[in-house]
C-alpha cells in the first residue's frame, strides 16, 4: 500500500498475521466491519450475493491490496463477501484500534485515509469499467 514509517508504526500495534485457506471467507455481507486486511500473498474475491444465492465477483485483491474498507464508515457493516480464492496470507488489523490511533494522531490518520481512499477510487473505477463491459458504453437515448 506504500505507507510511510509513521503509518507502519500505527498499523503494527493494531494487527497480526493471519492465514486464510482457499475457499474460506474473511467476512460476509451484513456482519460487523471490525477489521481491515492487508493482503501479503494470495488472492481474495469480493463478491455480491444475487438472487437465488448466485455470486458475482466484483473485484479481486492480490498481494499489496486492501480488503475490508467498510470499517471506515458507520454503521460499520460489510456490504460484500470476501472469499480467499487461493491460500492467502494477510495482516488483520483491528478497526477499533485503528480508529483510536487515527483520532489520537490526526496527521497519521490523514496519511492512512489518503491511501485507503486511493484503494476505494481504484475499486470504483474497476466497477465502472465492469458495468461498461456488461451494459455497453452506449445508451439507447
What is the role of each PLM region?
Residues 12-13, 32, 53-54:
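Short alpha-helix capping/helix-loop boundary micro-motifs
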Residues 26-31:
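Short phosphate-coordinating micro-motif centered on Lys-Gly-acidic
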Residues 58-114:
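Cyclic-nucleotide recognition modules
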Residues 85, 111-141:
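Polybasic "coupling" helices that flank or enter modular domains
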Residues 1-22:
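Cyclic nucleotide-binding regulatory module and flanking cytosolic helices
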Residues 44-56:
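A short beta-strand-loop-beta hairpin characteristic of the jelly-roll/cupin
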Residues 23, 34-47, 63-65:
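Glycine- and acidic-residue-biased ligand/ion/polar-headgroup-sensing regions
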